[in-house]
């Protein structure tokens, strides 16, 4: 039984060592590839539509707030026949952002007190 445990520990150690070396070699090549792809992607990135601006040309182009992406909301003004679309933040996401901000500030105060 002791021999079996000893061999299993030895096997796991050698296996983890060999896999980390293979991963390290893969990571260096993969990092270079990803950096070149990200550079190309940043060039292609289009500008986002700010909040309360017209988004009828591209309904998925609204900018992100601190935590969530704004949503393109379309409506018909009273007495109008044409549709108006603007980037807006839904109320429930607005309240969630405010709550997260207050929790973050409260966490900072606690860290000061006990830190």
Curated annotation (Swiss-Prot):
Prosegment residue ranges: 23-44
Tree of life domain: Eukaryota
Pfam family, one: Toxin_35
UniProt KW keywords: Disulfide bond, Knottin, Secreted, Signal, Toxin
Entry's Gene Ontology cellular component terms: extracellular region
Presence of keyword Metal-binding: no
Tissue specificity field: Expressed by the venom gland.
Subcellular location: Secreted
Family named by the database record: Belongs to the neurotoxin 19 (CSTX) family. 01 subfamily.
Free-text note regarding domains: The presence of a 'disulfide through disulfide knot' structurally defines this protein as a knottin.
Descriptive protein name: Toxin-like structure LSTX-D2
Organism field: Lycosa singoriensis
